Amino acid sequence: KDIWTSISAKVDSSSGKPLSGGKPGSPVQGGVPCSAYIGPNGSGHYVKMVHNGIEYGDMQMICEAYHILASIAEMDSYEIGQVFEKWNEDILDSFLIEITADILKQSDPSTGKPFVEIVLDTAGQKGTGKWTSVNALDMGVAAPTVAEAVFSRCLSAIKEERLAAAEILTGPKLSKLDGDKSEFIDSVRDALYCSKICSYAQGFQLMREAQIEYDWNLNFGEIAEIWRGGCIVRAAFLQKITEAFNRDSNLSNLLTDDYFNECITHYQSNWRKIISLASMNGIPIPTFSSALSYYEGYRTACLPQNLLQAQ
């Protein structure tokens, strides 16, 4: 344990933000170490798998926010990068938002074009997102946002088919933004945050079911804590998850925690508006829309599966 603690990433004890310093390759001194013993029988590997599945969701949601801003608000890459940079100072403060802001502000030295615009829009996968989705199906746990993030990569990979389909299939004409641009940007941020809450709720619910199935004793607050540094999903948001499980270690779903419930209540009007606008403009938003559908399903006392059962 002492070895892992000494070489692990560290975060500030008050802010929860990752610490840096020292020589390259040397352990960071001070701070709270982002390492812990998860449990026996591969439980640590399982938690890492779910982390990666959540990561798939995070990355796809960010891509959808970018697509909406570029399409409806007609913002260029650099301008969107500035927006992401601002978002990184608030509730969306995270490694992925930070590097996305940097990427969007880069230009290709050969062509002078925005760097992101010369990157081919096809994405592969290493398998952990798929494993998370398959395991969720095996467990009977709803994790649609992670699954949609995986399917988005699958769809992106068939570039030639999409090029051909674009010449044949029809959709709505893209309409320009009608209204205040800054308010629209804030609405996209709110939609991203609400979708993120639902994605993490799915991931942590999957781990909760896994501990029952595999007879583990997972500390979910601690898991969120150690993800704050040295992980792709490291974010200020994780501190809120730790606080939620500190309030109630038996929390069934993050959505029922007071903080996250208040966030969804406050931001959901903008969340719904952005999803509606994207749909009306023919913009694919699989993780945004699946997150909202998950929320709707989870809060609905009587679902139409009574008819399914009757069938």
Q: Model regions: which residues?
A:
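Rossmann-fold NAD(P)-binding glycine/threonine-rich loop
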Residues: 1-8
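Short, well-structured alpha-helical segments that form the helix of a local strand-helix-strand
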Residues: 4, 147, 289-292
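C-terminal substrate-binding/catalytic lobe of Rossmann-fold NAD(P)-dependent dehydrogenases
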Residues: 10-48, 52, 56-280, 284-285
